[in-house]
Curated annotation (Swiss-Prot):
Functional note: Together with its co-chaperonin GroES, plays an essential role in assisting protein folding. The GroEL-GroES system forms a nano-cage that allows encapsulation of the non-native substrate proteins and provides a physical environment optimized to promote and accelerate protein folding.
GO biological process terms, semicolon-separated: protein refolding
Location of this chain's protein in the cell: Cytoplasm
PANTHER family, alphabetized: 60 KDA HEAT SHOCK PROTEIN, MITOCHONDRIAL
The protein's assembly and partners: Forms a cylinder of 14 subunits composed of two heptameric rings stacked back-to-back. Interacts with the co-chaperonin GroES.
Top-level taxonomy: Bacteria, Bacillati, Chloroflexota, Dehalococcoidia, Dehalococcoidales
Listed name of the protein: Chaperonin GroEL
Gene name of the record: groEL
SUPFAM superfamilies, sorted: GroEL apical domain-like (SSF52029), GroEL equatorial domain-like (SSF48592), GroEL-intermediate domain like (SSF54849)
Binding locations of ATP: T29, L30, G31, P32, D86, G87, T88, T89, T90, G413, D492
Length: 537
């Protein structure tokens, strides 16, 4: 296909337009008085939401070059969401400020590479200072505060704190939709392991990049499945029992994987393929744990069994299976309580007998997976639109709470970034590198400015007051007062603030040194779509 190419100043103009279009849409959601954005859906009511990364993911611009700018800033939000679960709007606001300030200086004759070096040195110093300023989470009340701020609801804050109190900071917590009107919590048998779906084609929720399987039938094997010949007889048997199939295998490859994907896309069956956790003997043991939890049996090479020997009794069952690219959670397996209890006793005995610290750790992980179970938070509401918005807030609150426990907390409301600014005074740089540091200084005020602006205040006035306040003091936009942010319960997880700054600067540096863009020339009369292929397999 023929390409269109632009250079120099045209590149900066196009990228800036794309960055500004996306950032201006998202930044209105920042802070406790931020405004939601309505996203059109192809069917049904629009989704009204104030989650920055969800809004950003929905934006595609018609101009190919402007869209590149938007997609790069979207990447900053997505990386922050993946790392910390929150801070996505902050990362977009910071990226926009860094890019716009850098472009002004480039237009005035600054060298992009030297600006980039200055920005990198400033961000490295700020990250170190943020870690120094961070304080560990102390007690349940601070967990309530973190979850309340991110979830924008005290009920969500108390809910997350109560659940984490019961399952522990490393416990498995899942969030699902409910037919009720409020929040409900339950604790069920379940396990989570560090393997995700084999192919993204199995995703059922593109927004969260997750595959969710209700009333799942589970086939477990330590075999590698490569050909249709070995898969098809088993598949035909299972389809007579259930159309919701989860395959947990050493691997599914080549022809077999292609067959599953094609049938999934055609709607012939609802399927998810996941790699089995662990390796060697540990993999066999974990598959056996899974089989006991779900009431099935492992189709094992050691037992001389092939896939075509599968029977209904071999299949495990669970109320729900959720898988992303990294993890899979089995919820409410239908295994016998007595069998699970006996398996836990067996693992305990192995822990006592082993002399290897590594083996003991892995056995304890298996024991925790069977003993701990899974906490389920069911989110309900009067309408589907409200329910999805609530669910997104609960997910963000949970992710932010885990981040706070891991790296500690800072004063919230953008104050943590402003408190770290003095560390830049120690950087003795010259020329364009010093200008790069100044660009970062200007960008760091933007989160506070936009929190205040969205609350109907003059953002610049609020920023000046916060800068001249004691360390840890900032602006409470919810109550329109200044004071000690920690005492007012306004705190941010250090990981969220650090990730937002790190990812915003990374994307900004990429944008400011880019000097040419290449895109396809769009056909004004595109070809009609291919007709759907008939038949199964």
């Amino acid at each position: 296909m023929a390409k269109q190419i632009i250079f120099g100043e045209k590149v900066r103009v196009s990228l800036k337009k794309g960055v500004d279009t996306l950032a201006n849409t998202v930044r209105v959601t920042l802070g406790p008085k931020g405004h939601p954005v309505a996203l059109e859906r192809k069917w049904g009511a629009p989704t009204v939401i104030d989650d920055g990364v969800t809004i950003a993911r929905d934006i595609e611009l018609p101009d190919a070059f402007e869209n590149m700018g938007a997609q790069l800033v979207k990447e900053a939000a997505t990386r922050t969401s993946d790392a910390a679960g929150d801070g996505t709007t902050t990362s977009i606001v910071l990226a926009q400020a860094l890019i716009n300030e850098a472009f002004k200086n480039i237009a005035a004759g600054a060298e992009p590479i030297n600006l980039k070096r200055g920005i990198e040195k400033a961000v490295a110093a700020l990250k170190a200072q943020l870690r120094k300023n961070s304080t560990p989470v102390k007690g349940k009340q601070q967990i309530v505060q973190v979850a309340t701020i991110t979830g924008k609801d005290p009920e969500i804050g108390n809910l997350i704190a109560d659940v984490m109190d019961k399952v522990g900071k490393d416990g498995v917590i899942t969030i699902e939709e409910s037919r009720g009107l409020r929040y409900e919590t339950s604790y069920v048998e379940g396990m989570q392991f560090d393997r995700g779906y084999i192919s993204a084609y199995f995703v059922t929720d593109p927004g969260r990049m997750e595959s969710i399987m209700e009333d799942a039938t589970i086939l477990m094997t330590d075999r590698k499945i490569e050909t249709v010949a070995e898969l098809l007889p088993a598949l035909e048997k299972i389809l007579q029992i259930s159309k919701n199939l989860v395959i947990v295998a050493e691997n599914v490859e080549a022809e077999a994987l292609a067959t599953l994907v094609v049938n999934k896309l055609r709607g012939n069956l609802n399927i998810l393929a996941v790699k089995a956790p662990g390796y060697g003997d540990r993999q066999k043991a974990m598959l056996e744990d899974m089989a006991i939890l779900t009431g099935g049996h492992v189709i094992s090479k050691e037992a001389g069994r092939k896939l075509d020997s599968v029977t209904e009794a071999d299949l495990g069952h669970a109320r729900r299976v959720v898988s992303n690219k990294d993890k899979t959670t089995i919820i409410d397996g239908e295994g016998s309580a007595e069998a699970i209890k006996n398996r836990i006793k067996q693992i305990k005995a192995q822990i006592e007998e082993t002399e290897s610290a590594f083996d003991r750790e892995k056995l304890q992980e298996r024991q925790a997976a069977l003993v701990g179970g899974v906490a389920v938070i069911a989110v309900g509401a009067a309408t589907e639109t409200e329910m999805k918005e609530r669910k997104a807030r609960v997910e963000d609150a949970l992710a932010a709470t885990r981040a706070a426990i891991e790296e500690g907390i800072l004063p919230g409301g953008g104050t943590g970034l402003l408190n770290a600014l003095p560390c830049l005074d120690a950087l003795k740089l010259e020329g364009d590198e010093a200008t790069g540091v100044s660009i970062v200084r200007k960008a760091l005020i933007e989160p506070v400015r936009w929190i205040a602006t969205n609350a109907g205040k003059d953002g610049n006035v609020i920023v000046d007051k916060v800068k001249n306040s004691p360390v840890g003091h900032g602006y409470n936009a919810e109550k329109d007062v200044f004071g000690d942010m920690a005492e007012m319960g306004i705190i941010d997880p250090t990981m969220v603030v650090r990730s937002a700054l790190e990812n915003a600067s990374s994307i900004a540096n990429m944008v400011l040194i880019t000097d040419s863009l290449v895109a396809d020339i769009q056909d004004k009369n595109p070809a009609p779509p291919m007709p759907e292929a008939p038949g199964m397999y």
